[in-house]
Amino acid sequence: MKGDIKMKQNYKIFLLVAEELSYSKAAKKAYVTQQCVSNHIQRLEKELNTKLFSKNPYIQLTEAGKILYNAVKNMEIISNNATKSIREISDGIKGSFTMGISTSRAKVILPNVLKKYHEYFPDIEISFYVNDTSILEKKLLDGEIDLFLGINTSQNENFKHTFLLNDYMHLIISRSLFQKYFANKDLEKFKSGVDLINFSEVPFTLYYETGALNLIIKQHLLFEGIKFNKTPYYISDCDTQIHLCQSGITAAIVPKMLSLNLKEHNMECKSEDEVYIFPINNFNYPLRIDLVNNMNVEQPFYINSFYQIVKEELEKMMN
């Protein structure tokens, strides 16, 4: 594309082959012949004096190829970022970035954050890509987003983690469901923390087996020797779990951050529709919340300022 900061064609072809693990698919994407792709790889291997791919029986990156892939991928991200910044200047745009975040946390975090951020940076354009942390990690490595709000993000040498806070799981249960299983005198006692063993007969909505939150809940239940005997529903969407709880159908275990909207619900609803929120005793599996960006890309002032505002607003919300 005209105006791009160009990367050597050999490296572009190498990236395609490394990602497709197929000369024919790489050729199709590059609109060249398979022989042309082969020639580019051969020239690059000769230049570096090493094999970048092995074929036994399928094409794979060698150790040298993996090192080169990481380096060239970062070069591509830096190149694209520089091109984007230059275009913004020439087009008169003050700046833009793309952030990854989960749907549930976007609803809780963004209204307050963007209200304050807009006061200082009214001309910055922000796009939001909504998905789970594992997907957002890949999008960042591929250069498709600039940063993301991660929950227990994996440790990767290309990631820079900016710690925000630790979130903890809380039990939520409607007043109507609570009264079916507990006496009024239990309410005051539970406000300081509940033992999940006392809720073994209460119906719960739980998370999918593959979900990260399901894993830490299972670890706690296993360690404490607890079994929930009534789990009619499984869904990883916390918003749905909260709505089922509000309806009095099931209880749920959700991060404290995502239960914050229930406080507003409790202030506005009738007393019989209140939802109780309890901390869980001995639940030693915090959710580490970070803002994550690519270590190799220098962040402009307006993104660093966004980090600071997110941190300040989260601390206000959680206290």
Language model features by range: what are they?
Residues V113-K116, T133-A183, H265-N266, Y276:
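Short beta-strand-centered segments that line the small-molecule binding cleft or hinge
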Residues Q9, Q34-Q35, K84, S90-F121, ...:
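N-terminal winged-helix
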Residues N156-F163, D167, I197, D239-N296:
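Beta-alpha-beta core module
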Residues Y11, E47-L48, L68-S90, F306:
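Alpha-helical linker/hinge and terminal dimerization helices associated
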Residues Q179-Y181, L187-E224, K256, Q299-Q308, ...:
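Secondary-structure junction motif
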Residues D132, L141-E144, I151, A212-V275:
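Hydrophobic hinge/microswitch elements
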Residues E45-E63:
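A short LG(V/I)-centered, amphipathic sequence patch enriched
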Residues L15-V32, Y58:
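Short helix-boundary/capping micro-motifs
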